[in-house]
């Protein structure tokens, strides 16, 4: 006998919708719980089975917390700006707005079919002008506080996409989306000064409960380095340049210096003999992406400028080279090379026959760089010193001589914030003919994205908005002409603050009401994929800290607990993708097995953070378990089974209380697979009984409800209840019922285990000895032996010594 999910699931989804069951309560006498999913990008492909894994996890927590008497905020929305919709629109001639609306409608249908307890009244969409009004407002505040600025910088220009890409969007010299070639090109761009928050972004990781590997990824991305900035003079010139080094103690081993090919001094210092070689090399470098330039495995390339610098610590002349592995945007765009103790410098020196001088004892620098630690040699006043002492002594000397100083640098760069695309938030800025730049007045926000029929990139580096002359060209009251900013914001903008808008999504006066922000922040649990470990999470933390500084939000950090669900792979253990043809559509699973089965299966596959292959057999197993529950409690006629009674059953008492305790604990700690195992153990025990107390059945159904809510609601109704199960008080357990009154005793002969027995915990030594001697297996092993000694450890063992 099986239940009819096709009838049952729509019935309860309609009930929840009509009764507004999951509307967020804001009862001042209750604690608040904010469970957040990483909101989806509504693609044309719709949901795949990977999406519901994280959504089910937050839904289980949300449903449990409601039953535990908390106000629960569990919202959903759409991260709907961005390249894919625009690319689709360009390829098909469709309007990205219409395409996005269709996709959202499809995603909404799919998500509702899975029974998630979202508060749909709080739905947000980053492309809604009432939403992006506040994205623009945040940008204006950043600008007013000196954290948004324009700069001419070398950017990753992708001609095929017609836009600039952030470093994070370039993989192996190609665009992350589409795999198109990417080139370096100087362009005017909007930047956000995330570097101003580097230390706080680093230090405040200690305030949050996040996976350590995600914290480490952020720490590495920020890349705080302590060292010294050292000034080198250029021979026969008044020019100087600075290098940053974490090892100023190795200055005596600096035998050459290297500039980034874009360094401003190159033109001034290159000798006539080297000019042609330098120009040729610079042109070659323009075609390389940052990743190609810094690839450790590639052959080293470079060219000598003909100029020399003076090593400030020993007065030696050292040649100045240019090489692509030095990047202008990192450090100072120039390095001192210590080939004896750095692998990359060593390879470069080997390639071009440059001097290699060891300054640390250890290794054979004729064969390879020695990168370990050892006492200093060939270093005058540093000789014999260990690393830390030598670093301190070197910096002290540099500062005393006025040619260097202690410095902290970061790997983190400012955030490249503009995109040369149409489908994004307009940047609310006007450039006037007299050179002034002003913000669109706050009362005129949102600055609406104009309708456009032709949204192909201009190809010049300007966005398609540049073609909309009526929108771009403006005149102020005094007749001064200006042009609107034509770049748009990146997709990261809307997702950097969306969790704040859920708290008060209809507010027209502010991002959200201040009191409500105090009530709900920080987010209690945030679940999503690890692929957002650096970018989204770093950007959201940056904006949150800025909003904290200007008094908008009450907390330093946005997300208290973060959890990354694993990836659901195809049956062949490969990532699901359209090209591989192994994508599983949840619609088909819901149609065949039901939403509760999909939810149960995805939570039972393994630990939530593990990546596991999809398996149809596992789905069938999950459905069989749900059918087993149904058959135990419900008759063929659809009424409550007779074995569900109001009488007590001592045989189930311990199993029930153990289940309540364990399942509650496992749900709280996101160990849903082991929680489900406990539900299975109880059902197995219940099948062995002639009667099951109704109280236990109700408690079981409540524990089941966060995972299989439709089935649980149906069973709850059959149990005689007229209200939804969603707010019934969560079951409690009695610790005294869990106390073991029996214990397993090991029986030994001459220290070797011969038998095991279960006895009352209260038995004393004499009774245990008697039982041991009467045990059949012990009798067999003691036959013909004289008992010399009996050792009894109550609650553990009886050992009979004989010969």
Swiss-Prot record:
**Entry annotated with the keyword Cytoplasm:** yes
- Per the database entry, which stretches of residues form a coiled coil? none
Lineage, top-rank taxon, reads Bacteria
Which protein is depicted?
Leucine--tRNA ligase
The entry's family comment says: Belongs to the class-I aminoacyl-tRNA synthetase family.
Q: Which gene encodes it?
A: leuS
Instruction: Select a single GO molecular function from the record's annotations and give it.
Output: leucine-tRNA ligase activity
Record the organism: Listeria welshimeri serovar 6b (strain ATCC 35897 / DSM 20650 / CCUG 15529 / CIP 8149 / NCTC 11857 / SLCC 5334 / V8)
Q: Name one GO biological process term.
A: leucyl-tRNA aminoacylation
The cellular location(s) given in this protein's UniProt record come to: Cytoplasm
Name the chemical reaction catalysed here. tRNA(Leu) + L-leucine + ATP = L-leucyl-tRNA(Leu) + AMP + diphosphate
């Amino acid at each position: 006998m099986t239940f009819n999910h096709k009838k049952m699931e729509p019935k309860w989804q309609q009930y929840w919708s009509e009764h507004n069951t999951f509307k967020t309560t804001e009862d001042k006498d209750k604690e608040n719980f904010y469970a957040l999913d990483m909101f989806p990008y509504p693609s044309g492909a719709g949901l795949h089975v990977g999406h519901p894994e994280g959504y089910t996890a937050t839904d289980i927590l949300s449903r449990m917390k409601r039953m535990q008497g908390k106000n629960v905020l569990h919202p959903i929305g759409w991260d709907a700006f961005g390249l894919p919709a625009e690319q689709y629109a360009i390829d098909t001639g469709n309007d990205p707005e219409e395409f996005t609306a269709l996709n959202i409608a499809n995603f909404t249908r799919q998500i509702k079919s899975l029974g998630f307890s979202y508060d749909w009244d709080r739905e947000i969409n980053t492309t809604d002008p009432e939403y992006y009004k506040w994205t623009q407002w945040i940008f204006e505040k950043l600008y007013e506080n000196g954290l948004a600025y324009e700069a001419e910088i070398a950017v990753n220009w992708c001609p095929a996409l017609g836009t600039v890409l952030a470093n994070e969007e370039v993989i192996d010299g190609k665009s992350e989306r589409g795999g198109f070639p990417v080139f370096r090109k100087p362009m005017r761009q909007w930047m956000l000064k995330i570097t101003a928050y580097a230390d706080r972004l680093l230090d405040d990781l200690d305030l949050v409960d996040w996976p350590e590997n995600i914290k480490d990824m952020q720490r590495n991305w920020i890349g705080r380095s302590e060292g010294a900035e050292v000034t080198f003079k250029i021979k026969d010139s008044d020019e100087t340049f600075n290098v940053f080094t974490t090892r100023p103690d190795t200055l005596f081993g600096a035998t050459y210096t290297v500039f980034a090919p874009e360094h401003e001094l190159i033109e001034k210092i290159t000798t006539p003999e080297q000019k042609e070689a330098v120009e040729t090399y610079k042109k070659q470098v323009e075609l390389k992406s940052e990743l190609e330039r810094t690839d450790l495995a590639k052959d080293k390339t470079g060219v000598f400028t003909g100029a020399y610098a003076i090593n400030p610590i020993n007065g030696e002349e050292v040649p100045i080279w240019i090489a692509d592995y030095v990047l202008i945007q990192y450090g100072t765009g120039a390095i001192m090379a210590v080939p004896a103790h750095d692998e990359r410098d060593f390879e470069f020196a080997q390639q071009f026959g440059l001097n290699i001088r060891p300054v640390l004892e250890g290794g054979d620098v004729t064969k390879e760089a020695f990168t370990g630690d050892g006492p200093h040699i060939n270093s005058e006043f540093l000789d014999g010193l260990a690393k830390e002492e030598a670093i301190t002594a070197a910096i002290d000397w540099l500062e005393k001589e006025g040619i260097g100083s202690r410095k902290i640098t970061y790997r983190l760069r400012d955030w490249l914030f503009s995109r040369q695309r149409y489908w994004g938030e307009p940047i609310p800025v006007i450039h006037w003919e007299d050179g002034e730049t002003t913000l669109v007045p706050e009362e005129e926000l949102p600055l609406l994205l104009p309708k456009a029929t032709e949204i192909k990139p201009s190809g010049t580096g300007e966005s398609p908005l540049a073609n909309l002359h009526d929108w771009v060209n403006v005149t102020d009251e005094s007749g001064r002409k200006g042009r609107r900013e034509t770049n748009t914001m990146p997709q990261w903008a809307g997702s950097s603050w969306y969790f704040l808008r859920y708290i008060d999504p209809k507010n027209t006066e502010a991002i959200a009401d201040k009191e409500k922000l105090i009530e709900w922040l920080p987010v209690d649990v945030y679940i999503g994929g690890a692929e957002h470990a650096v970018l989204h999470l770093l950007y959201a933390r940056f904006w949150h800290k800025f909003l904290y500084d200007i008094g908008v939000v009450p907390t330093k950090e946005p997300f208290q607990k973060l959890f990354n669900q694993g990836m659901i792979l195809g049956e062949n253990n490969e990532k699901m993708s359209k090209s591989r043809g192994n994508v599983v559509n949840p619609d088909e699973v819901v149609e065949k097995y039901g939403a509760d089965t999909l939810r149960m299966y995805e939570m039972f596959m393994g630990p939530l953070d593990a990546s596991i292959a999809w398996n149809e057999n596992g789905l069938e197993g999950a459905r069989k378990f749900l059918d087993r529950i149904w058959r135990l409690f419900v008759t063929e006629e659809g009424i409550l089974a007779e074995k569900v009674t109001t009488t007590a059953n001592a045989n189930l008492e311990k199993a029930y209380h153990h289940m309540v305790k364990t399942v509650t604990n496992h749900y709280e700690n996101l160990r849903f697979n082991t929680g489900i195992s406990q539900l299975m153990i109880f059902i197995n025990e219940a099948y062995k009984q002639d009667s099951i107390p109704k109280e236990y059945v109700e408690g079981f159904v409540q524990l089941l409800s966060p995972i299989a809510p439709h089935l649980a609601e149906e069973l709850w109704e059959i149990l005689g209840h007229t209200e939804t199960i969603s707010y019934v008080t969560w079951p409690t357990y009695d610790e005294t019922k869990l106390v073991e009154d029996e214990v397993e005793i090991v029986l030994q002969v001459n220290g070797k285990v011969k038998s095991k027995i279960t006895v009352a915990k209260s038995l004393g030594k004499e009774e245990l000895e008697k039982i041991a001697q009467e045990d059949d297996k012990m009798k067999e092993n003691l036959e013909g032996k004289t008992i010399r000694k009996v050792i009894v450890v109550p609650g553990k063992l009886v050992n009979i010594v004989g010969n």
